[in-house]
Amino acid sequence: MPLSYQHFRKLLLLDDEAGPLEEELPRLADEGLNRRVAEDLNLGNLNVSIPWTHKVGNFTGLYSSTVPVFNSEWQTPSFPDIHLQEDIINRCQQFVGPLNVNEKRRLKLVMPARFFPNLTKYLPLDKGIKPYYPEHIVNHYFKTRHYLHTLWKAGILYKRETTRSASFCGSPYSWEQELQHGRLFFKTSKRHGDESFCSQSSGILARPSVGPCFRSQFKQSRLGLQPQQGPLARGLAGRSGSIRARVHPTTRQSFGVEPSGSGHIDNSASNSSSCLHQSAVRKAAYSHLSTSKRQSSSGHAVEFHNISSSSARSQSKGPILSCWWLQFRNSKPCSDYCLSHIVNLLEDWGPCTENGEHNIRIPRTPARVTGGVFLVDKNPHNTAESRLVVDFSQFSRGSTRVSWPKFAVPNLQSLTNLLSSNLSWLSLDVSAAFYHIPLHPAAMPHLLVGSSGLPRYVARLSSNSRNINNKHGTMQDLHDSCSRHLYVSLLLLYKTFGRKLHLYSHPIILGFRKIPMGVGLSPFLLAQFTSAICSVVRRAFPHCLAFSYMDDVVLGAKSVQHLESFFTSVTNFLLSLGIHLNPHKTKRWGYSLNFMGYVIGSWGTLPQEHIVLKIKKCFRKLPVNRPIDWKVCQRIVGLLGFAAPFTQCGYPALLPLYACIQAKQAFTFSPTYKAFLCKQYLNLYPVARQRSGLCQVFADATPTGWGLAMGHQRMRGTFVAPLPIHTAELLAACFARSRSGAKLIGTDNSVVLSRKYTSFPWLLGCAANWILRGTSFVYVPSALNPADDPSRGRLGLYRPLLRLPFRPTTGRTSLYAVSPSVPSHLPVRVHFASPLHVAWRPP
């Protein structure tokens, strides 16, 4: 006869009419009983022959992926001009006095952030924009390209101009070495003479493949080759130019550059238009005139003709340089859907590329990408705006994967101890938080995104994708890409983007200037950054509380008026550091704070309402006696696990589900087990904050017996059969709690101390979780434990009773100053003088 739910509850001692605990509880540790119950509840039967269920409510498992929806009306979000102040440490010190080591170290980590993976795999430009929406290829291409352009304009991306230089918009940082007209320009240095400056820049931009003698003159650095100063280096740089110039003296003409008399381009500043320009020209000459093998590897992806204005003017001089888009102007329409109809709509399509406000030197960056991008809805509640997803998962895979740094996430109890109080709360919204943190330019070659330009993208993805030859010159090839679909799409997009269609149809390679979201390093850096800032704020306002997790920042104060003035001061401080807040999204919570999916008030912590509703919906849809795919079980456990600490039996109740996921087998819910879980999650109990106090109740056990010391009282007992030591210690702790009712118990067992009961026999874990709910444990060494003697059967010997103080833990999140108490009545002026210099103790 299967086990009924009532009987199962009684078995777990969840009902009041259970017998004496000392007899009932040890029975639950019996392996035989655990096995029989598991069989009765059909928990152990993992091998099933019926087909698995792959969908429960919204949860899907193997073989079914949610089809993303493309929205042709997506708006690209606007990004403020985010520029985090470089002297952020000095500004913080002016605000709060000297920073402690922790804060300094964290702020230095992000100014600038560095990222050097072991190995970077470069992908062809065609893979830059993922064909995520096959029905909307062209539309998705332009929307993504527009998003990337917006990020570049906002100073979040670099644009690769040549192998060794990039341009960007916005304010430069000191570690970005600026090139002015192709020369390296250091703000700090006095310029000694044009000649040496120019030779230096030509060294930077010259290709390192000239030969060993050339390379040896330059010292290799993280940012590429840097010449050693001196006449030899200077002469060599000049000669390297001349070696190149003689290779193809005839080709120079077609590139719109007048060579000097001898056919030798001199490298001094007086008679060259710009070193940057020459190197671009050189590169173009090389890339088009070397062997076909070189051609195929370059992916014809980057058009070099538009690096400077002079070469852009010479568009009509040769077929190599002409722009795909503008070529349609001179061609006969091939059909009613020929792109030439669109190109002839406008006289002036604008430039082929846009130049940034600043040019900087970068390490050698290939014309490739390292990750693909695509667009999705900004979030489930906001489908009007798009969000860019960047796939840099290559850095988390394979043998060369980067092991990302770990960082402290506050656990539920720490969070409750810290934030459960009678304060008034508000939360700040940092806009585009990740894009605040600058990346060193040396990381650029590893974080590249971009696109190969419209013609290649469309040709590669269209059904009749012909091999793209190198005969761009012939009109037939030009019209290969004309199609009704492309024509209609472009006509609609013309309304949105206008002449930008031309700009966006060109290839582009962009590197990240601020940390991207798709790299495991970013959450770590953001967490370090916001926690350091909050630590500074707490020190400046010791009678208030500021706390952050990633980009979620909350402020708390004793009264609403106090909170408002605190909010104003903090906002001004954050703005002075260059942190952008979103004023429309500031939320005032009153006395119960919504944070990290929890509601935290003076009574403790509970999960937020939307999570409770999700759980109820999940149970409504949960099928009984049908095997459920383990991948779906993973999703279910993820949801139930979040709310498990608020239930009677906690995580141990979910152990059968964990076991099936580990075995990668289907799980079948029996009616009793489902009813048990359902009841567990219908009544949620708040997790309360721990109070500090003195521990006066101690428990200890041996495999055969247990002992308690409560004040001056001693108790002991024996087990029917010897038990594993951890199980015995857990039982002793349960007896101590039920006998004394004390919320503080001293134990010498680390497993009991951890309050994780998932490694014990299943039934015992569930029962112990309910008995010990809300109990805090203090570690007492065995030698000092007053319950040690009774557990060994000796009641006569008294060890002195310890006075063990208990301090509630706030985990590693407690970077927080000791606050003086605040008077309950409000003074005339809220006094912000900090007693910190006296009271602050480093954590």
Swiss-Prot record:
A Pfam entry, by short name: RVT_1
EC number in record: 2.7.7.7, 2.7.7.49, 3.1.26.4
GO molecular function: DNA binding; DNA-directed DNA polymerase activity; metal ion binding; RNA-directed DNA polymerase activity; RNA-DNA hybrid ribonuclease activity
Location of the region described as Polymerase/reverse transcriptase domain (RT) in the Swiss-Prot/TrEMBL record: 347-690
Source superkingdom: Viruses
Keyword terms: DNA replication, DNA-binding, DNA-directed DNA polymerase, Endonuclease, Host-virus interaction, Hydrolase, Inhibition of host innate immune response by virus, Inhibition of host RLR pathway by virus, Magnesium, Metal-binding, Multifunctional enzyme, Nuclease, Nucleotidyltransferase, RNA-directed DNA polymerase, Transferase, Viral immunoevasion
Reverse transcriptase domain location: 357-600
Site (Priming of reverse-transcription by covalently linking the first nucleotide of the (-)DNA): 63
Alphabetized PROSITE patterns for the sequence: RT_POL
SUPFAM superfamilies documented for this protein: DNA/RNA polymerases
Binding site for Mg(2+): 429, 551-552
Domain free text: Terminal protein domain (TP) is hepadnavirus-specific. Spacer domain is highly variable and separates the TP and RT domains. Polymerase/reverse-transcriptase domain (RT) and ribonuclease H domain (RH) are similar to retrovirus reverse transcriptase/RNase H. The polymerase/reverse transcriptase (RT) and ribonuclease H (RH) domains are structured in five subdomains: finger, palm, thumb, connection and RNase H. Within the palm subdomain, the 'primer grip' region is thought to be involved in the positioning of the primer terminus for accommodating the incoming nucleotide. The RH domain stabilizes the association of RT with primer-template.
Note: Hepadnaviral virions contain probably just one P protein molecule per particle.
Function: Multifunctional enzyme that converts the viral RNA genome into dsDNA in viral cytoplasmic capsids. This enzyme displays a DNA polymerase activity that can copy either DNA or RNA templates, and a ribonuclease H (RNase H) activity that cleaves the RNA strand of RNA-DNA heteroduplexes in a partially processive 3'- to 5'-endonucleasic mode. Neo-synthesized pregenomic RNA (pgRNA) are encapsidated together with the P protein, and reverse-transcribed inside the nucleocapsid.
Protein's name in the database: Protein P
Species the sequence originates in: Hepatitis B virus genotype C (isolate Vietnam/3270/2000)
Gene name in the database record: P
